[in-house]
């Protein structure tokens, strides 16, 4: 990791966020991480991260961002999961509402770089062909469409400025998160097409 700001803010400091925080701390950064549960806040504190209790769909919780926004220079990583269909808040509220709320807050700080973690779900192609950064997104479901729209909101912060970046990750796996682990432990068969390919990335590779 090169060319880092003096401080970082990880919005949505969960499974991937904790791995990222550990690497940033190793490089001498002061790291702020947002969580929703007090138990998660304590876990971050034990890592050396300044925990921020925040709900991206609730602007009333945003004053907690003040210490991070006071940094002389700040790198921001937006890692908030999109939520579940039929859940509360809805994926639309989490993805579009969350990004809109947070980006308004970031205008108050000296943000040097902003990275939004999106998903390969924006591509939607399921024919087994090769997909890369130059492939035209063709989301086939609501989640992919919302993520693509959210990417647009993020890039609007400074149009054409490469400091505002989008990273599209595949499914995460790693310690404590193995595809099909629950079924294997219970002795149940893995349901699905045995010839299908899994699109995955290890959490440590994603953090790097």
Task: Describe every region a protein language model picked out.
Residues 8-12:
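Conserved N-terminal Rossmann-fold NAD(P)-binding element of oxidoreductases
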Residues 100-140:
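Conserved Rossmann-fold NAD(P)-dependent oxidoreductase catalytic core, especially the SDR/UDP-sugar
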Residues 17-18:
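N-terminal Rossmann-fold NAD(P) dinucleotide-binding loop
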Residues 72-115:
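NAD(P)-cofactor binding segment of oxidoreductase domains
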């Amino acid at each position: 990791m090169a060319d880092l700001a003096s401080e970082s803010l990880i919005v949505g400091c969960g499974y991937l966020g904790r791995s990222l925080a550990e690497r940033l701390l190793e490089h001498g950064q002061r790291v702020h991480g947002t969580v929703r549960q007090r138990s998660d806040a304590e876990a971050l504190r034990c890592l050396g991260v300044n925990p921020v209790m925040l709900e991206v769909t609730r602007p009333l919780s945003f004053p907690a961002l003040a210490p991070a926004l006071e940094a002389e220079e700040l790198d921001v990583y937006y890692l908030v999961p999109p939520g579940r269909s039929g859940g509360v808040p809805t994926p639309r509220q989490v993805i579009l509402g969350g990004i809109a709320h947070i980006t308004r807050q970031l205008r108050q700080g000296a943000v040097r770089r902003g990275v939004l973690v999106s998903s390969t779900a924006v591509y939607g192609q399921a024919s087994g062909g090769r997909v890369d950064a130059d492939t035209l997104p063709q989301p086939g479901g609501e989640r992919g469409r919302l993520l693509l729209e959210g990417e647009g909101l993020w890039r609007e912060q400074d149009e054409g400025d490469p400091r505002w970046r989008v990273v599209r990750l595949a499914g995460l796996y790693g310690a404590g998160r193995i595809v099909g682990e629950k079924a294997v432990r219970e002795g149940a068969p893995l349901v699905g097409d045995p010839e299908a390919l899994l699109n995955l990335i290890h959490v440590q590779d994603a953090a790097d």
